[in-house]
């Protein structure tokens, strides 16, 4: 009786393997360039035609191969990078499976020319559809040249899934950008249809990033250097204003290998969570180093995912490393990153004179609709008060006297206050820059950081109500409240069941006194209802704290006097992450003198 299970022929198994390894032209480039880097090259030249369909050619200056090794390289699972199973847990190379070359050769017309260092001649091999057709001696420079023509010529079904030439060329460019950033010591050249797309000379990391991602972005990157024993996190991170709508600019590397790992991405987003609105992604170039035996890279065909032995430690180290830079908000405090190119010249004396003239004009301009009666603020003067009390965080009122006595000259305290616009924005001058501060966002950040510190110390200030208030809750809201009653108590709420669907509210967080705290409580319960089984109260804590902070501070039009502005600025200088509110919105924006002059065609 004939068997139904058959051993597949080698050419078919190679095509199946190619389906996992070779998804598109960029996949071919990835495997070939990684081999070149493993070979110790100092230069890689990548050329493609028709998006990689017609030709992919990779030339490197690596160690090259002998005739015997070149032939073995086209056999499945033949590699020089591992010899035993223990080597899988101490990998120091990008490639190791020995699948790439035979898989690529099985779906293309493949040519390999190589010459080992010190050899007097090279070897050239031609294969078609995985079968070696010709082997001969050749003359060439030391290194390796691989040409892949007519990709997927024998698998027409795969060709149907190929995109346009421009799209495929774009994928190749993105892939090469990732690889080139990982090795700034290696020259990378990328040519598409005879046109040079980029030429990245060997340089330091900042210069390499400037070449590939643009000098404007490079100017907004700040260095990172964090170590926790054998675990290290280094690289460059951008200020929040450079955020993107997708994760395309998360350049993350584990031991030099580009990865798209959920643990790493979550750590990055957690660090930036208070700086960006939801749905935005930062720009980071991170190099994470861990002992080779602490990470498994053999868990995905494309090696883009890894598995850490101590996942939590790696996550926390990445988050702590990023927060160590973000906490200082260097882009606000003028701690400019070193530039790989010349800075613009300083403003001329004439420009400075024009700034003074503009400021003098602004001081005289005071339409009642938008500004307070007096626009200029002498050090001891105050704005003319409008009718009604100003709602400020408690800390601001308590610290008024102290802030007058302090000699702190942080960034915010060093600003020269011009006035208040629409009783919602504080206008300041910083040298020749015009700085606009959203007073609500600033108060919100101060209140949030204070509340977070109080919660961590179990010392949230609570304000007991003179008369308890009743609140009617749905069955679902009531169940949520019972489940999280203790946590809400730590937040400063005191509630007890009154009967049926009615609850008594006896106390609220002190920050919320004088506000619509019932609405805030309902919003928190709604937030808790969306947690689900996969999340805990701790996961939603920062969202809840930011909601309380937002509801507790001044909103809309609220005039502030000079003492109140000084107190706010002193608090901002003492507050971490002060450039953004807890929801990620910016606290301040700056207009440089050249930008203002361009507005007026100067």
UniProtKB/Swiss-Prot annotation:
GO cellular component: mismatch repair complex
Keywords noted in UniProt: DNA damage, DNA repair
Swiss-Prot/TrEMBL GO biological process terms: mismatch repair
CDD domains, per the entry: HATPase_MutL-MLH-PMS-like, MutL_Trans
SMART domains: DNA_mis_repair (SM01340), MutL_C (SM00853)
Keyword field contains DNA damage: yes
InterPro entries: DNA_mismatch_repair_CS, DNA_mismatch_repair_MutL, DNA_mismatch_S5_2-like, HATPase_C_sf, MutL/Mlh/PMS, MutL/Mlh/Pms-like, MutL_C, MutL_C_dimsub
Pfam family, one: MutL_C
GO terms for MF: ATP binding; ATP hydrolysis activity; ATP-dependent DNA damage sensor activity; mismatched DNA binding
Function summary: This protein is involved in the repair of mismatches in DNA. It is required for dam-dependent methyl-directed DNA mismatch repair. May act as a 'molecular matchmaker', a protein that promotes the formation of a stable complex between two or more DNA-binding proteins in an ATP-dependent manner without itself being part of a final effector complex.
Family affiliation: Belongs to the DNA mismatch repair MutL/HexB family.
HAMAP family reported for this sequence: DNA_mis_repair
Record NCBIfam families: mutl
Name the record gives this protein: DNA mismatch repair protein MutL
